[in-house]
């Protein structure tokens, strides 16, 4: 790593410590050229995959839009705002750690539905009606029967 004081291209690591709470590594470095010490904080760079819509357009993942859609689906259901926030956080975490560059909107909807089915079937049905592509009412009925049959484990 380049020294921030003298721009010497090579520095030595004097000490490394794992920072558990931040998932980071703190390193104390020493420059052999100027003799100064400095610290660095290293974290993994996780990128959020882009969402590929039905029209094949790429757009950034929008957590607020997901939160709004979940809130609309949860109207008159037992799903609490805290559960909605947790579902959004869990979805973001899964997207970050997926390692994918892009995710189809249908796969994103399935990911959210899987979590919703564990929490509240009514909200999951409303969410599915908005975000899954059903060719006809029979497809929706088939999906609903499968979701009920598996008891939210679909």
UniProtKB/Swiss-Prot annotation:
Residues 49-139 form the ATP-cone domain. The keyword Nucleotide-binding applies. Its cofactor is Zn(2+). GO terms for biological process: negative regulation of DNA-templated transcription. A zinc finger (unnamed) spans 3-34. Binds 1 zinc ion. InterPro entries: ATP-cone_dom, NrdR-like_N, RNR_NrdR-like. Keywords: ATP-binding, DNA-binding, Metal-binding, Nucleotide-binding, Repressor, Transcription, Transcription regulation, Zinc, Zinc-finger. One of its GO terms (molecular function) is DNA binding. HAMAP family: NrdR (MF_00440). Negatively regulates transcription of bacterial ribonucleotide reductase nrd genes and operons by binding to NrdR-boxes. PANTHER family: TRANSCRIPTIONAL REPRESSOR NRDR. Belongs to the NrdR family. This is Transcriptional repressor NrdR.
């Amino acid at each position: 790593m380049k020294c921030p004081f003298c721009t010497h291209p090579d520095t030595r690591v004097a000490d490394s410590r794992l920072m558990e709470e931040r998932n980071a590594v703190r390193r104390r470095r020493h420059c052999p050229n100027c003799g100064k010490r400095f610290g660095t904080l290293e974290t993994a760079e996780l990128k959020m995959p882009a969402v590929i819509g039905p029209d094949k357009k790429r757009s950034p993942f929008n957590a607020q839009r997901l939160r709004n859609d979940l809130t609309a689906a949860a109207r008159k259901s037992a799903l609490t705002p805290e559960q909605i926030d947790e579902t959004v956080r869990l979805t973001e975490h899964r997207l970050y750690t997926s390692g994918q560059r892009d995710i189809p909107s249908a796969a994103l909807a399935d990911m959210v539905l899987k979590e919703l089915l564990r929490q509240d079937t009514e909200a999951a049905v409303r969410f599915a009606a908005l975000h899954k592509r059903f060719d006809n009412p029979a497809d929706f009925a088939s999906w609903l029967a499968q979701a009920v049959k598996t008891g939210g484990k679909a």
